[in-house]
């Protein structure tokens, strides 16, 4: 579903240039839970932003569902992006909107009628186990609950791919386990391909089928989780 071919990304500053990614090639298959692991500053978040072309690679190609993103117009890219949802470390919820309205928000943007959006939002809140919090506000929720709302919101427009950028790193170990279990269930039930960006080995071991290790902008290793962790070269 995602092919990354020889992607490099160079950021040019006033006095220097930083090569954030150096010739990365990866295939992520439909239905995978794919972990991308590395220390902070290794280039993981840059890579994930290249996957939906929020960052354009300096060289190389990104192919999503047989479409080379570099050949698409801005309007076509927007269409592809509706199939790629994202959740973040800090949840990025709208604080002045209720939980229900947060989940409705992406549907409003694409013009879903209010009644249909609310119905779908309630179904999603049920999936993430927060139906009873529909009228609450983000400030009244725990970290784990906020991330559940963010997951419900990410699923609103039925994406095919879910990108998780350090989605559990602000959570305690028990809550992390619960969120990972939820992601696993969503992957199984809806066949959504999940890409998990993390610096935590335990997260990858818990739910990923495949893993890539990024080190200083380079692909140090990749393969199934069993392969990579049983013969660590890096």
Task: Label each PLM-derived region with a short phrase.
Residues 52:
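Helix-to-loop junction immediately C-terminal to a conserved catalytic motif
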Residues 67-68, 104, 108, 115-132:
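Conserved ABC ATPase "signature" region
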Residues 137-141, 145:
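Conserved ABC ATPase signature
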Residues 156-160:
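A short, proline-enriched helix->beta-strand linker immediately N-terminal to the Walker B motif
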Residues 204-206:
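A short, surface-exposed alpha-helical micro-motif characterized by mixed small hydrophobic
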Residues 222-223:
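ABC ATPase "signature
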């Amino acid at each position: 579903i995602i092919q990354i071919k020889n992607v490099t990304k160079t950021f040019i500053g006033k006095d220097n240039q930083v090569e954030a990614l150096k010739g990365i090639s990866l295939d992520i298959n439909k239905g995978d839970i794919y972990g991308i692991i590395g220390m902070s500053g290794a280039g993981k978040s840059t890579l994930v932003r290249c996957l939906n072309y929020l960052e354009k690679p300096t060289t190389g190609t990104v192919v999503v569902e047989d479409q080379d993103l570099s050949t698409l117009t801005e309007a076509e890219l927007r269409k592809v992006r509706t199939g790629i949802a994202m959740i973040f470390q800090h949840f990025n919820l709208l604080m002045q909107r209720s939980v229900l309205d947060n989940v409705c928000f992406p549907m409003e943007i694409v013009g879903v009628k209010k009644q249909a959006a609310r119905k779908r939002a309630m179904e999603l809140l049920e999936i993430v186990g927060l139906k009873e919090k529909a009228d609450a506000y983000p400030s009244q929720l725990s970290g784990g609950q906020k991330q559940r709302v963010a997951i419900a919101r990410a699923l609103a427009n039925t994406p095919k791919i879910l990108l998780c950028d350090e989605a559990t790193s602000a959570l305690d170990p028990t809550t992390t386990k619960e969120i990972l279990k939820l992601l696993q269930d969503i992957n199984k039930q809806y066949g959504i391909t999940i890409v998990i960006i993390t610096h935590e080995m335990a997260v990858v071991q818990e739910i990923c089928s495949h893993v890539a290790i990024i080190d200083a902008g380079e692909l140090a290793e990749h393969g199934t989780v069993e392969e990579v962790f049983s013969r660590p070269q890096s």
